């Protein structure tokens, strides 16, 4: 990878962003300031590593000159050569193509699949797992919509998960690998003979656009229905037609939101979800030819196609994409997911380096 032109462009962009962020006028537009802050946070480690590398190279040149006259500098030359090799590897890793959405917040949908009531209960377990993980990281979780099963599981649920600051590695960078079919093996609460059953639930994850206006949505393409809420949105729920269902006619995408207190708030939230799904659809279509080999999120919840298995009798979790296995399923379901996510991120980083 040739780093010089790319680094020069990044140094210039970093300097320009530093000026912009110091200008109070930028912060009058919260969305623009946040976008600039995230980009600045992404570039800062690259700039810092490049500066360390440049300094080390200068020091090496000086040490080599001195060692020609004084052999005592030979050890310093060796140390600097080792340090430079390490910094070059770090910089090469940083310059690998990044996911442009890594700093974004997300919308996450959990849907029950085959397995009836047991699948719905497992879908609720998954939703709680993500909520616990978000709480561990200090992120904000909002339940936008939920449809409960008879036993308190989730037929489907939509969560908005947002970080509370500007970071190059935001919510999407950690949870983007969760899209797909999750399989569970356990004895259902409805099983009287103690037999282990297999069922599945599906997860869809979308990066959330900074503003709905960033995504072109023609109002004439929408059918908007209102109905009485059935969720837990607090005062006003079940007394007025505050829930909103939006159907995007060209794609058939249907979005519902009922947990906000007013119809206006629910419509705004539903439009956010729709914008995220349309953005993801457009990007998926644009990348279909260029990245045909990369796995996409599985939109049909089929037990035969899965990314991960949760085996309760053996307290084992297995991610089939990277061969990750751990016997701490109880902790994982309580939000202890970092070891798994680190393994997935490492595999993704390796693939991006190979592409570069």
UniProtKB/Swiss-Prot annotation:
SMART domains named among the record's database cross-references: PCRF
What molecular function terms (GO) are annotated for this protein?
translation release factor activity, codon specific
**Is the Zinc keyword given for this protein?**
no
- What post-translational changes are documented for it? Methylated by PrmC. Methylation increases the termination efficiency of RF1.
Q: Which Pfam families match?
A: PCRF, RF-1
Describe the task this protein carries out: Peptide chain release factor 1 directs the termination of translation in response to the peptide chain termination codons UAG and UAA.
> What's the name of the protein?
Peptide chain release factor 1
Question: Gene encoding it?
Answer: prfA
């Amino acid at each position: 990878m040739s780093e010089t032109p790319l680094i020069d462009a990044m140094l210039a962009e970093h300097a320009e962003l530093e000026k912009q962020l110091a200008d109070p006028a930028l912060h009058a537009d919260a969305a623009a300031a946040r976008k600039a802050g995230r980009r600045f946070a992404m570039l800062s480690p690259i700039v810092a590593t490049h500066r360390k590398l440049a300094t080390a190279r200068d020091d090496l040149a000086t040490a080599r000159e001195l060692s020609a006259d004084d052999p005592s500098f030979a050890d310093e030359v060796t140390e600097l050569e080792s340090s430079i090799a390490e910094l070059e590897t770090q910089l090469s890793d940083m310059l690998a193509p990044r996911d442009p959405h890594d700093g974004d917040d997300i919308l996450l949908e959990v849907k029950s699949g085959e397995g009836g009531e047991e699948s719905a209960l497992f879908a609720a377990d998954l939703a709680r797992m993500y909520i616990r993980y978000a709480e561990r990281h200090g992120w904000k979780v909002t339940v936008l919509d939920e449809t409960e099963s008879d036993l308190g599981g989730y037929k489907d649920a939509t969560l908005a998960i947002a970080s509370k600051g500007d970071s190059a590695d935001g919510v999407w960078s950690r949870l983007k690998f969760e899209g797909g079919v999750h399989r569970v093996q356990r004895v259902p609460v409805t099983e009287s003979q103690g037999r282990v059953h297999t069922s599945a639930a599906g997860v869809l994850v979308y990066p959330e656009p900074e503003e709905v206006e960033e995504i072109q949505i023609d109002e004439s393409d929408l059918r908007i229905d209102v109905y009485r809420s059935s969720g837990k949105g607090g005062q006003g729920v079940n007394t007025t037609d505050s829930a909103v269902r939006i159907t995007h006619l060209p794609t058939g995408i249907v979005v519902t939101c009922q947990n906000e207190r007013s119809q206006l708030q629910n419509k705004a939230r539903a439009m956010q979800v729709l914008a995220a799904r349309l953005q993801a659809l457009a990007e998926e279509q644009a990348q279909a030819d260029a990245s045909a080999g990369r796995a996409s999120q599985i939109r049909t919840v089929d037990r035969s196609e899965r990314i991960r298995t949760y085996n309760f009798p053996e307290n084992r979790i297995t991610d089939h994409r990277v061969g990750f296995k751990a016997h701490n399923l109880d902790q994982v379901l309580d939000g202890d997911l970092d070891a798994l996510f680190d393994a997935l991120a490492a595999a993704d980083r390796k693939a991006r380096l190979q592409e570069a």
